[in-house]
Design a protein with these regions (language model features):
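Structural signature of Gram-negative outer-membrane beta-barrels, strongest in the C-terminal barrel
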Residues: 431-433, 452-500, 509-672, 703-705, ...
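N-terminal periplasmic accessory domains that precede
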Residues: 97-100, 120-123, 135-138, 155-158, ...
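Gram-negative outer-membrane beta-barrel transporters
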Residues: 27, 537, 662-682, 688-772, ...
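Short strand-turn segments of transmembrane beta-barrel domains in outer membranes
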Residues: 187-223, 233-245, 760
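N-terminal periplasmic "start-of-domain" segments of outer-membrane beta-barrel proteins
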Residues: 32, 43, 48-92, 116-121
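Short acidic/polar hinge/loop motifs at secondary-structure boundaries
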Residues: 143-172
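Acidic/polar loop-and-plug regions of large Gram-negative outer-membrane beta-barrel proteins
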Residues: 249-251, 256, 260-262, 267-343, ...
Length: 844
């Protein structure tokens, strides 16, 4: 069941694509999207890409194609859209796909976990658990994954920005509800180069100081004939990463490419993506939070830096567990985020008889990987944890590392801080995250006496597999930012109650929640229609989308424990006396079908060629997926209530756009009402989530370009409240967790001849760590700085420092999000500390 459906999709689409050239013969009109791509590539090829993108940072005359039926300028549209070119992305210091989004107003991207698994929100829509539930990542207009918040498999994990990316278009607000399924909040479209003109780049990046990374990027493309062109590029890298974990945690790379054949009236394109990459997983770490709930003081612990410390260690790289089939599985912790993608896709556009235009896109991806990272479930004194595990009189010894086997006579002096952590190893195998998507549309333009009319009819189909195997274990570990060791516990009777640092198979302190497996499939079908009318200076547009989801499959957890000799040494150690195993005989079904009608209607009025007003009303939906499993969201027969399976988001927005020769300003007021059903496995007080939210605010995005000086800036004011909570009514009226009132960014730069210097400032005001609104997370400002020197027209060198001032910026608090603890101990995740790297680039 896992691959046959995807293969059937591949065959059907391949046959369709094979028929397209014959149908396209003798057509003679150019398509709007190809025109936009061509214009952009030509600009980038003349005088270098950086110079092309130096043009106005918020260019309201730029044509955009994302979540819109036709290519249209920002000034002429009624949608909120931002665009980042490749040079802007490089100068911002963005390391991953989610990092790029921090520079966009209205977007809150918590990318503190490394190059994947980011938490992403837009305009106050909640991040109740993890991922980006109400947004969609796209690659050339097609979803990377159907859902943005799949546990341990978020779309940014399967997308690696590199030299292939020409620009990123970000559409915020309800217009995306009509042009994409499961994206009522925003669409992030990563658009690749298509080889309009001959050329490319090669770049080398080398980390400095504690930043251990080496990376080679390249891309090249150009015409093959007058009507055929290509582009190919990718990267390879290795190193420990942003934190010194003591082993190679970054390794692998990516290769992407496409070939385009222009025909009369359109084009045919085939593309591919190959990704096999490993990145370290950065989860919360131990730290000190003292002071008051309203004004806490956040500091590193002795021997453990909040910014650069990690629980990963060269002394702990192997985990033994039982998988869903009951077989032994050995995991290499160095795999971290292991992401594998083998994808092919295609796009075609041409005219039919009667002035109708056909646009066809498909993507078929075989996705798989794993997620492995240490999570500090509890931090306390080593003596207290020894007693918690082994009872009164329990003693400690080193389980591995340079002191393996030695007794710890003075736990209060352990690692210079006297602390230890009960660590839960998040260990998830992702054998099948395959998806197949297809989007077919027909469009036509009409000239009427009152103005031009554009009409689009389309049909979207996708199949998303989600197959996961969770096998978490519990360990005891020293609190050291580098080279930490596992600990053993011996009870007062002299009996070892741990084994090589292993406290338990599974996570008994969390009720063994996280020994589970599931094999589910979600099929989306969505016919849609949109139209626009431009009478004079007005532009009216609207659309309808009818989404249907069909869910099938099964899921199973553990039921009780068994005595199993997991390590096959012939001895039953204490952890082997209570081993949780997935009970496949008690697997529960998933079997339901749900529908929802979505709409979006907008208007834009050009007061002058440089000033416009716009407004929009939308109702979108997010169809829930694996987050309903295990949380009580499904009935025993596999069905789900409509309000649980489908979460509706109603949005209203309006604003003004203004542009002059040197400046641009985009101001948008917004209002959103959101339903949310979810689960959070790391929360032991609010595991189930059933809430409604209301958020309102204002977005500001502007730019100033004057001579050698350029600046892009933005800010978002958000007033968000929980308006209903079926699980915890006491939270009604509170601010959602981690939602700041203000989020802001600014990117100034100045060119001194061949030298360009600049910075990116990313900031947030304070927010609450949890929905009860007890403990505050302080606001912070992160500063990234760069300097680039053009040696000649082809060669440049640059120096980049991310988080220049090594700021602590908390994005979540985990162990005690409600209040400062008496001992000041807690766990939290911060933005990465200072990383400095040098780059060399040569234009081919």
């Amino acid at each position: 069941m896992k691959t046959h459906s995807v293969r059937r999709h591949a065959l059907a689409v391949a046959v369709l694509l094979a028929l397209l050239p014959a149908a396209a013969i003798a057509q003679n009109d150019s398509n709007s999207q190809a025109t936009v791509a061509s214009a952009t590539d030509k600009a980038a090829s003349k005088g270098g890409q950086a110079k092309a993108e130096k043009a106005k940072a918020v260019n309201l005359s730029q044509m955009v194609v994302t979540a819109s039926p036709v290519a249209i300028s920002k000034m002429g549209s009624s949608i909120s859209v931002s665009t980042l070119g490749s040079s802007q992305i490089i100068d911002s210091g963005a390391q991953g796909a989610a990092d790029i989004l921090r520079d966009i107003p209205g977007i809150r991207a918590e990318s503190s976990g490394g190059d994947g698994n980011a938490n992403i929100s837009v305009r106050g829509l909640p991040v109740a658990s993890g991922g980006g539930k109400f947004v969609q990542f796209q690659l050339d207009g097609m979803p990377v994954l159907e859902f943005g918040d799949t546990a341990f498999a978020t779309p940014d994990t399967f997308l690696r920005p590199d030299f292939n990316i020409r620009r990123v278009e970000v559409v915020r607000g309800g217009s995306a509800s009509v042009f994409a399924s499961n994206a009522p909040g925003a669409v992030f479209n990563f658009i690749t180069k298509t080889g309009e003109h001959k050329g490319g780049d090669i770049g080398l990046t080398y980390g400095l100081g504690n930043y251990d990374t080496r990376r080679l990027d390249f891309d090249y493309g150009g015409p093959i004939t007058d009507t055929t062109r290509y582009h190919i590029g990718g990267f390879v890298h290795d190193g420990q990463g942003a934190k010194p974990v003591g082993y190679t945690a970054q390794s692998g790379g990516q290769l992407m490419g496409n070939i385009t054949h222009d025909i009369d009236g359109g084009f045919l394109r085939l593309n591919f993506q190959y990704l096999d990459d490993k990145e370290p997983v950065y989860l919360p770490v131990p730290l000190s939070i003292t002071g008051s709930n309203g004004s806490p003081s956040v500091n590193s612990l002795a021997g453990f830096s909040v910014q650069s410390g990690a629980l990963q260690s060269p002394y702990f790289q192997r985990d033994l567990a039982l998988n869903a089939a009951g077989n032994r599985i050995i995991t290499n912790l160095a795999d971290g985020y292991h992401s594998k993608v083998h994808a092919i896709g295609g796009e075609a556009e041409f005219k039919l008889n009667g002035d109708w235009k056909l646009h066809e896109q498909f993507r078929i991806a075989s996705n798989s990987g794993s997620f492995t990272g240490p999570y500090p479930a509890e931090v306390n004194t080593a003596a207290a944890l020894a007693q918690e595990i082994g009872g009164a009189g329990a003693t400690l010894s080193y389980a591995n590392g340079p002191n393996a086997g030695q007794a710890i006579s003075n736990p209060a002096a352990l690692s210079g801080n006297g602390l230890a952590t009960r660590m839960h190893l998040f260990n998830v195998t992702l054998p099948n995250m395959d998806n197949a998507t297809n989007n077919l549309s027909f469009s036509r333009s009409f000239d009427t006496a009152s103005g031009p009319v554009d009409l689009q009819l389309g049909y979207y189909h996708s199949l998303q597999h989600i197959v996961q195997d969770w096998h978490w274990n519990t360990y005891l570990q020293t609190v050291q930012g580098q080279n930490s060791s596992l600990l053993n516990v011996t009870n007062a009777a002299g009996q070892a109650v741990t084994y090589n640092g292993l406290v338990a198979y599974g996570t008994p302190y969390w009720g063994n929640c996280c020994v589970r497996s599931y094999d589910v499939q979600y099929t989306m079908d969505a016919p849609f229609v949109s139209a626009s009318w431009e009478p004079g200076n007005w532009r009216f547009d609207g659309g309808l989308r009818f989404d249907r989801i069909r869910a099938s499959g099964s899921y199973a957890g553990s039921s009780g424990t068994s005595v199993i000799d997991v390590n096959l040494d012939g001895v039953i150690q204490v952890p082997e006396q209570t081993v949780p195993v997935v009970n496949n005989n008690a697997a529960m079904p998933v079997n339901y079908s749900k529908t929802h009608l979505e709409y979006s209607f907008g208007a834009n009025y050009l007061l002058t060629t440089n000033l416009a007003l716009f407004g929009r009303a939308s109702s979108g939906a997010r169809f829930n997926s694996d987050r309903l499993l295990f949380g009580g969201g499904l009935n025993a027969n596999g069905n789900a209530p409509q309000g649980v399976a489908v979460n509706v988001v109603k949005q209203y927005e309006g604003g003004v756009k203004w542009s002059t020769k040197h400046t641009s300003l985009f101001v948008t007021a917004f209002l959103a009402n959101t339903q949310e059903q979810n689960q959070d496995v790391t929360s032991q007080t609010h595991f189930l989530i059933s809430r409604t939210y209301r958020s309102k605010g204002v977005e500001f995005e502007g730019s100033l370009d004057y001579g050698a000086f350029s600046m892009r800036a933005g800010a978002t004011y958000t007033h968000s409240r929980i308006t209903g909570d079926a699980i915890t009514p006491a939270d009604v009226g509170n601010s959602p967790q981690r939602q700041a009132t203000w989020v802001f960014q600014a990117s100034p730069s100045y060119r001194f001849g061949a030298l360009t210097v600049g910075a990116t400032l990313l900031g947030t005001t304070q927010s609450y760590a949890g929905n009860p609104n007890g403990l505050v997370m302080p606001g912070y400002t992160q500063v990234n700085a760069f300097g680039r020197y053009d040696i000649n027209d082809r060669m440049s060198i640059s120096l980049q420092a991310d988080n220049l001032f090594n700021t602590i910026g908390l994005t979540e608090i985990d162990q005690s999000p409600g209040a400062v603890q008496g001992n000041g101990l807690n766990t939290a995740r911060s933005i990465l500390g200072r990383t400095v790297y040098a780059s060399w680039n040569y234009r081919l």
